Amino acid sequence: RVPVGLVTFAPGTINAYHIHHKGGQILLVTGGRGWYQEEGKPARRLRAGDVVVTHKGIKHWHGATKDSWFEHLAITSGNSEFLEPVTDEVYEGLENQ
């Protein structure tokens, strides 16, 4: 069994860095505008129709832009370990990209 969840973020809301240790995650963006970023890599701006594949063991975060809600289907294999929050400096800097 692989769980599928519909996740909605209010404008300006993001999750913390996290890792999926035993499997990966697929995000199917269904609405709004958001961000996805793997640690040490540039952030990716997301909109409806985008697909993100995160492989197991990759530290990452995702969530809404400051001015839009964001919604995706999350297909996640294995448990998630949530880590430190994304800093305001990192998140605020994305709006200038």
Model-based region annotation:
Residues R1-Y17, G23:
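A short glycine-rich, His/Asp/Glu-containing loop-to-beta-strand
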Residues P3, W61-Q97:
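Double-stranded beta-helix
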Residues F9-T13, R33-G34, S80:
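Short, charged/polar surface micro-motifs in flexible loops or helix N-caps
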Residues V7, L27, V52:
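Conserved GNAT-family N-acetyltransferase fold
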Residues K22-G34, E39-G40:
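Glycine- and acidic-residue-biased ligand/ion/polar-headgroup-sensing regions
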Residues T13, K22-G23, P42, I58, ...:
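A generic "binding-loop/recognition-motif" signal
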Residues G40-G57:
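Short acidic-glycine-tyrosine-enriched beta hairpin
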Residues A16-Y17, Y36-Q37, R44, K59-T65:
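Short beta-strand His + acidic residue motifs that chelate non-heme Fe in jelly-roll/DSBH
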